[in-house]
């Protein structure tokens, strides 16, 4: 009772807190640990060239186990095979637009070890990375990747496909005498062929008794030139929190310093010493296996009885058979060739970025100096009937771009897949004492560079955008341009004031819907 009264007296005697004032508390600096905000999409540089090292997951080790009973004191082998390592896969997707979301080092999960009672280890999870449509893969080191098409032939068991991934048709649970004789050679290039013998029958009988079904998931791998893109694999789940084993740290020792995003975006476009081009991913859903997982080691239940009883093989070859195979490693260079409906082509400072901002909601960097745009910018032009056209702002081209002058190859590769070419010409290049190039000569130089880079590129549907019509004397220059270039749609505009932009939108739509559009021929351009 007295304690309750004492607590009440203390509560009454405590002073009240001071009234809140209008003065707030401000931090001089941001709290520690808070990440800075990411720059908006328009101000971030487009990463269209990327270096990637990939390693498949190692196979799990086979289990060495004996099952003893009253009738069999020595015991029978019942160790299961190790699981196959996961693959590293590139998946083509429309949800990404460059390589900024990729990691320079990718590694799939390791297969689980086999256990007793003839239980096979779980297959390692695949590591899947999404790349934009139009990605070109070049191989520097490692084995050649291959596109894959899934064709399941029967109902699949969850332990066979933990993440709905492919499994090699050469299962690690099958054995043969050829494998036993070639142990001294490289095991990574060998597979285990099935043979009718007692050891194999015991192995497969143990698998069926444990699972009830044949644990095989056949996958057909096809070459790049044979892939028709008609059948795409289903979505595959990926564990983003995959942790690597300590025994795999050797893969990362050679590359301790990873490139920052700023180093990648500011990286110069140099000629890479690549051996050959591997594939081009142009359709959503295509998947490319760039690093394969290693096969799992054999358990003693699937090893020939003669080898198990032989003392000569028991220590050396038995240990090598039960060890899982390492995954393959590859070093790739990814390049992006933008896939857009319309490509804005022109000399530096012709007003291409300003025109893109007038046609769409894209906000590229705009300045009054040459080569403001070093990475292509893509905007979307939407019409009233919800018809959408993708417009790409290609960086400025100069004379000799086809010889890689002024990063020409890095810019020209983005034009290869555009359906329509819009030549943006500067009408005011020679006005008011400017030492520029007349618009008809600009057009001739652009046509020559495109034709030298890829024959037939200028035969695509084309139109001419005569920019900066608001300058004094630009009307006379435009009339002279119409006399020198004929047979091509021409639109005089002022991109910064958006004069003539609505007519240009209609012209682009008509050119997209035209049944027999015409390109630009060099012979139809009259130059002094």
Curated annotation (Swiss-Prot):
* OBG-type G domain sequence ranges: 340-513
Q: Which residues form the Obg domain?
A: 46-339
Its family remark reads: Belongs to the TRAFAC class OBG-HflX-like GTPase superfamily. OBG GTPase family.
Give a Gene Ontology cellular component term annotated to this protein.
Answer: mitochondrion
- Could you list this entry's UniProt keywords, alphabetically sorted: GTP-binding, Mitochondrion, Nucleotide-binding, Transit peptide
- The species is Oryza sativa subsp. japonica (Rice)
**What is the predominant subcellular site recorded for this chain?**
mitochondrion
Q: Which residues form a coiled coil?
A: none
Name of the protein in question: Probable GTP-binding protein OBGM, mitochondrial
Q: Where is the composition biased (Gly residues)?
A: 77-86
Q: Where in the cell is it found?
A: Mitochondrion
Residues that hold GTP according to the record = 346-353, 393-397
Record: transit peptide: 1-45
UniProt lists compositionally biased (Basic and acidic residues) regions at 197-207
Q: Which Gene3D superfamilies match?
A: GTP1/OBG domain, P-loop containing nucleotide triphosphate hydrolases
Write down the InterPro entries for this protein, in alphabetical order: G_OBG (IPR031167), GTP-bd (IPR006073), GTP-bd_Obg/CgtA (IPR014100), GTP1_OBG_dom (IPR006169), GTP1_OBG_dom_sf (IPR036726), OBG_GTPase (IPR045086), P-loop_NTPase (IPR027417)
Entry's Gene Ontology molecular function annotations: GTP binding; GTPase activity; magnesium ion binding
Report residue spans for region: Disordered.
52-87, 167-212
| Job of this protein | May bind GTP and have GTPase activity.
């Amino acid at each position: 009772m007295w304690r309750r009264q004492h607590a009440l007296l203390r509560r009454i005697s405590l002073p009240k807190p001071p009234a809140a004032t209008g003065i707030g508390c401000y931090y001089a600096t941001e709290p520690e640990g808070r990440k800075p905000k990411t720059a908006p999409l328009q101000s971030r540089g487009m990463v269209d060239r990327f270096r990637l090292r990939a390693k498949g997951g190692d196979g799990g080790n086979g289990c060495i186990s004996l099952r003893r009973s009253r009738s069999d004191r020595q015991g029978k082998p019942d160790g299961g095979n190790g699981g196959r390592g996961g693959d590293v896969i590139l998946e083509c997707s429309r949800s990404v637009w460059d390589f900024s979301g990729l990691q320079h080092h990718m590694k799939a999960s390791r297969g689980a070890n086999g256990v007793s009672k003839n239980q096979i280890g779980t297959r390692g999870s695949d590591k899947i990375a999404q790349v934009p449509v139009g990605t070109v893969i070049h191989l520097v080191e490692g084995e050649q990747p291959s596109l894959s098409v899934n064709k399941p032939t029967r109902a699949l068991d969850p332990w066979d496909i933990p993440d709905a991934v492919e499994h090699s048709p050469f299962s690690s649970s099958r054995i043969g005498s050829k494998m036993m004789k070639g142990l001294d050679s490289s095991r990574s290039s060998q597979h285990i062929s099935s043979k009718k013998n007692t050891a194999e029958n015991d192995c497969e009988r143990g698998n069926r008794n444990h699972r009830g079904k044949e644990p095989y998931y056949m996958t057909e791998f096809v070459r790049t030139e044979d892939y028709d893109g008609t059948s795409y694999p289903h979505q595959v789940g990926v564990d983003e929190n995959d942790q690597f084993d300590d025994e795999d740290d050797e893969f990362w020792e050679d590359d301790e310093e990873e490139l920052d995003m700023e180093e990648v975006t500011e990286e110069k476009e140099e000629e890479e010493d690549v051996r050959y081009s591997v594939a081009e991913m142009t359709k959503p859903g295509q998947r490319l296996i760039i690093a394969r997982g290693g096969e799992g080691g054999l358990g003693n239940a699937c090893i020939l009885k003669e080898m198990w009883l032989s003392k000569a093989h028991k220590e050396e070859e038995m240990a090598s058979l039960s060890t899982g195979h390492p995954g393959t490693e590859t070093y790739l260079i990814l390049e992006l060739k933008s896939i857009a409906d319309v490509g804005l082509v022109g000399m530096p400072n012709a007003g291409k970025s300003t025109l893109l901002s007038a046609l769409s909601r894209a906000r590229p960097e705009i300045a009054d100096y040459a080569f403001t745009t070093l990475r292509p910018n893509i905007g979307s032009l939407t019409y009233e009937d919800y018809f959408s056209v993708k417009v790409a702002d290609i960086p400025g081209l100069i004379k000799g771009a086809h010889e890689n002058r002024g990063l020409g190859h890095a810019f020209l590769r983005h034009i290869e897949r555009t359906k329509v070419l819009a030549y943006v010409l500067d009408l005011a290049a020679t006005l008011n004492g400017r030492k520029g190039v007349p618009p008809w000569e600009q057009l001739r130089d652009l046509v020559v560079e495109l034709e030298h880079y890829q024959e037939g590129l200028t035969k695509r549907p084309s139109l001419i955008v005569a920019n900066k019509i608001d300058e004094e004397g630009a009307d006379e220059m435009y009339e002279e341009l119409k006399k020198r270039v004929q047979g091509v749609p021409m639109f005089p505009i002022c991109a910064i004031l958006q004069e003539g932009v609505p007519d240009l939108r209609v012209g682009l739509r008509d050119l997209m819907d035209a049944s027999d559009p015409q390109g630009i021929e060099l012979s139809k351009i009259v130059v002094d």
